Amino acid sequence: MDKTYQPHAIETSWYQTWESENYFAPQGAGDSYTIMIPPPNVTGSLHMGHGFNNAIMDALIRFRRMQGRNTLWQPGTDHAGIATQMLVERQIEAQGQNRHDLGREKFLEKVWEWKDQSGGNISRQIRRLGSSVDWSRERFTMDDGLSEAVKEAFVRLHEDGLIYRGKRLVNWDTKLHTAISDLEVENHDEKGFLWNLKYPLADGAKTAEGNDYLIVATTRPETMLGDSAVAVNPEDERYKALIGKFVELPLVGRRIPIIADDYCDPEFGTGCVKITPAHDFNDYEVGKRHNLPLLNIFDKNAAVLPACQVFNLDGSLNDSVDGKIPAEYVGLDRFEARKQIVAAFDAAGLLVSVDDHALKVPKGDRSGTVIEPWLTDQWYVSTKPLAEPAIAAVEDGRIAFVPKQYENMYFSWMRDIQDWCISRQLWWGHRIPAWYDESGKVYVGRDEAEVRAKHNLGPDVALQQDNDVLDTWFSSGLWTFSTLGWPEQTDFLKTFHPTDVLVTGFDIIFFWVARMIMLTMHLVKNEDGTPQVPFKTVYVHGLVRDGQGQKMSKSKGNVLDPLDIIDGIDLETLVQKRTTGLMQPKLQKAIEKQTRAEFADGIASYGTDALRFTFCSLATTGRDIKFDMGRVEGYRNFCNKIWNAARYVLDKGEDCGQNGEAYELSLADRWIISQLQRTEAEVTRQLDQFRFDLAAQALYEFIWNQYCDWYLELSKPVLWDENSPVERQRGTRRTLVRVLEVALRLAHPFMPFITEEIWQRLAPLAGSTGKTIMLQPWPVANETRIDQGAEDDIEWLKGLMLGTRNIRAEMNIGPGKPLALFLKNVSAEDQRRLTENEALLKKLARLESITVLAAGDEAPLSATALVGEMEVLVPMAGLIDKGAELARLDKEIQRLQGEVQRVGGKLSNPSFVDKAPAEVIEKERAKLAEAEQALGKLAEQHARISSL
């Protein structure tokens, strides 16, 4: 083995070996165990969140594979409708064209070309993360097989009355020209205005105050062109007499009714609200309650139409309402129309006032444009009938959320679910399998031939397929079963579905998780006809944040690429990476400054195993993950520790009883074997409970503290002593080898590369056969090998050695200087342990003698430590330079006194205490307490040495 651990020297070659040997394919004889990778968008590259959930999924898959389960971890990517189309459109626009210049077919060819070029980027990253996915089953949501499954799902849901087409109000993205879901809308807090406008009363009606007008308050005066009513609260005494009367809509001259509805808040503005059902979601609900006409005033760009499109609530045309719009507003953008309409109200003396008002402005999460509630024909899934069984599946435990608290989030969403708009006005995606004849009649089928055959439509009937595509979440909602061959009843579908675990972030529980449950349970059935769930457990993790707890985002300039931590990156390349392609170029300087301050030397190469172990160690259930580069460095050191321990073991491991020779186990051997059983049980228990953090902690504690720090040291006196019996030496060698081999198997799910590299060399000595650690059996604790007596004896030994070490450190005595040790208050058990381990103790603690003091014996002036009730004494006379040590202590005491004075003064200063933040004051108090405690210890030490 190389002297130092170099991750890059082993990682790529081992991955290539595993993949070429087909080790990732299902092959266990046990029950199936399936995880479907949440498909990343084909547009992008993996970020830290992907890195995190890949580490978690691979830990689970490798763990279960070693347990003998028939594991399938299936990879794939999502076509990411809007994101991909936007990206390719930008590339085309850079060449002076747009998608309409190319036409649908040519544009889609460009998208497929781009997908083929960039799609490999994600699979390359997944490989670098060490993910043991079955590449032979890689899927893409636009693959032929998946496209057939999408069509089948749509047709079946339509036949079951769960998909319908309707004219409804949607979130319309005026830049992308598509409907988007509520979950793709971001509400931004902005300062806006509230316009108070006069609406004249019709037919000579007057208010209680004698006014011939009502004052309505609105944040969107431009939509008044489409008003259908003015609403007041039924309990509002000011307006009760006017309910059922009319106002004359200014600028337009249309008579609209005054209606009573609880939606109106009498305390807001004047208590009168204009109702525009075609351009406001709340108004739409009011319109439904009062059967108001829907007047659409905008085109797809949110520019004013030549005349309102007037509809009834069922989507049919309404010819009875005058939809005229004054010519001066036709063609104006909505915000320009706002200015001109307000000016017209002002000129007519109808503008009462303009008040400042805090607004929540809805914007598209991808386009950034203000979303317009707009009336369009869209396809919908009727979700309430699908939600009921999906809620029941979680309630009765067929699906469990880990942590359980996320069930409440799921239930609250599902119990208030709205119908799902699944059509998108895009070109990239699964085209809706519906056709229209020239009269507009719609036919749904798997293809045009099926439609014609089913409805007896001859070649003389022209059919046109719907131009819209399905919401990306519709196809990814079928992910667990469509990728296994559904609707065909394939062997893979029968074997690996339902899947076992879904690993996902909490932010897509509704986007994806809930929809997968609903669609799967409706479309996939068990042999007895009951609904099949898509997965048995949903493991929900938080967001991966930066070291300061900030969300990682391009605009904050704090994004980390997992591969840059694995391979390293120099500062200039990192700065360039973080500042290129910013949506807001003005942030460039601040991001560059921040990056140069945080990563002055760039990022070192830490390797995949250190990063993966970091992710697992941070995987506390449900909470956001604060990513800390210091942890990665610490776990890189952990890799080095394992590497160096392996080099020592391989150097000393020959003749370890591998051929059946006799051996004898020492106390230390029995102790480490006993500790190993406890660690095996603990790591298994925590992995079973998805506590990756506690499993990693148990592993780290065993390998670093118990095996490397203690057991390797305890082994040296046995192996280096020529007088040690051969059987004893062989027993220690055997234990060194076999305990390390088991520890490597325990660590393999977290750190696959380093464990494979070492295991290959260690396996012959440990008597292990097989080509790879990946397919070795998972360690199972053997309770008969837990030796409480050995554990107690070693704890006593460790206590004695640590006590002696502490005295050396406190008294500044060099580690190589032999000490005389006195023991006081020694019990019979202490005496037994001392008798059995005296030679070992002397070697490890560098002791020249050990003297047990009888009761009443006078002890020399000594530094002391306690092991249980036994006192450990080291006489000081002649061991230290008294004058030099006192001078050193005086200097340190003086420094600490200054610190106590400085911090104490600050805390007794009222102007500091009154103005400083609470956390700063708390920090200073902790600093003072620490300094005072250290000062007390030094004073005691000073007194002890002075008395020598």
UniProtKB/Swiss-Prot annotation:
Motif ('HIGH' region): 40-50
Alphabetical list of Gene3D superfamilies matching this protein: HUPs, Isoleucyl-tRNA Synthetase, Domain 1, Valyl-tRNA synthetase, C-terminal domain, Valyl/Leucyl/Isoleucyl-tRNA synthetase, editing domain
Keywords assigned: Aminoacyl-tRNA synthetase, ATP-binding, Coiled coil, Cytoplasm, Ligase, Nucleotide-binding, Protein biosynthesis
SUPFAM superfamilies in the record: Anticodon-binding domain of a subclass of class I aminoacyl-tRNA synthetases, Nucleotidylyl transferase, tRNA-binding arm, ValRS/IleRS/LeuRS editing domain
Any one GO molecular function term: aminoacyl-tRNA deacylase activity
Catalysed reactions listed for this entry: tRNA(Val) + L-valine + ATP = L-valyl-tRNA(Val) + AMP + diphosphate
Coiled-coil portions: 879-947
Cell location: Cytoplasm
The keyword DNA damage belongs to this UniProt entry's keyword annotation: no
Motif ('KMSKS' region): 551-555
Enzyme Commission number, as recorded: 6.1.1.9
A GO cellular component annotation in the UniProt record: cytosol
Binding-site residues, ATP: 554
Similarity section: Belongs to the class-I aminoacyl-tRNA synthetase family. ValS type 1 subfamily.
HAMAP family the UniProt entry points to: Val_tRNA_synth_type1 (MF_02004)
Assembly and oligomerization: Monomer.
NCBIfam families reported in the protein's UniProt record: PRK05729.1, valS
UniProt domain comment: ValRS has two distinct active sites: one for aminoacylation and one for editing. The misactivated threonine is translocated from the active site to the editing site.
Protein name: Valine--tRNA ligase
The species this protein was found in: Pseudomonas fluorescens (strain ATCC BAA-477 / NRRL B-23932 / Pf-5)
Gene that specifies this protein: valS
